[in-house]
């Protein structure tokens, strides 16, 4: 049985369809083709499917699926021919629309950091073909990331470091390319093949590295 997390999302690849379920993350079973719902557990985790195509709302990401305070923003009109009408954007502005750093001259560093809500993957295993997938676009109708400055878009998974602590592991990253047209839409799929990911409060996060002093170095994500 195959499952797929489509951006930013988890879903069953036997019924693979084009929806960003990590920007969706989309993971579903034949009997679960529905919106993700919270499970009443002590950790208050989400069940799969986990799906978000960013077409039903604008502004801050939905706190049912995403942790608050990320700085990432859902908008209509910033992507160029995206799969759905809404897209998730990353730049150098925080959740209040202010620069992360307005004191320095063109400061660089980690800007928006979007964490998924905890997802219960304990019922599944690496041999069940679970994956996270999404479409991404460099720039769109925003300001272009800078190849020379090492601007990048990064996906990380949360894994146990010790019995009581966790760490974030980079599982996918792309650096800005000056030769990539701003309307190019690319697809990413990250297979969950490590047993360390299959626990009851799995999380993934998406972050960007770029200029921290304004609405610069835009990256677009959709399902």
Label every PLM stretch briefly.
Residues 1-25, 213:
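Bacterial Sec-dependent N-terminal signal peptides
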Residues 20-84:
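Extracellular carbohydrate-recognition regions
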Residues 54, 115-145, 200-210:
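Extracellular beta-strand-rich recognition modules
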Residues 162-197:
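Extracellular carbohydrate recognition and processing domains
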Residues 71-129, 142, 220:
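Surface-exposed, low-complexity/disordered Ser/Thr/Gly/Pro/Asn-rich loops and linkers
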Residues 129, 138-174:
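Extracellular ligand-binding interfaces
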């Amino acid at each position: 049985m195959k499952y797929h997390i489509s951006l930013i999302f988890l879903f069953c690849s036997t019924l693979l369809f084009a929806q960003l379920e990590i920007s969706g993350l989309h993971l579903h079973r034949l009997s679960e083709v529905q919106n993700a719902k919270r499970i009443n557990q002590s950790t208050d985790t989400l069940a799969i499917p986990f799906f978000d195509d960013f077409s039903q709302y604008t502004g801050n990401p939905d706190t049912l699926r995403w942790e608050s305070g990320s700085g990432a923003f859902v908008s209509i009109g910033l992507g160029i021919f995206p799969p759905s009408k809404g897209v998730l954007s990353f730049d150098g502005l925080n959740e209040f629309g202010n620069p992360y750093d307005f004191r320095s001259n063109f400061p660089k560093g980690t800007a928006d950091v979007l964490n998924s809500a905890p997802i219960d993957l304990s019922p599944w295993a690496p041999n069940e073909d679970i994956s996270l997938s999404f479409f991404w676009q460099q720039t769109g109708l925003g300001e272009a990331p800078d190849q020379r400055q090492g601007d990048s878009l990064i996906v990380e998974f949360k894994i146990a470091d010790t019995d009581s602590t966790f760490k974030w592991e980079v599982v996918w990253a792309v650096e800005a390319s000056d030769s990539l047209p701003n309307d190019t839409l690319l697809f990413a799929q990250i297979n969950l093949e490590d047993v360390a990911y299959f626990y009851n409060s799995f999380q993934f996060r998406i972050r960007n590295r770029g200029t921290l002093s304004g609405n610069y170095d835009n990256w677009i994500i959709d399902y």
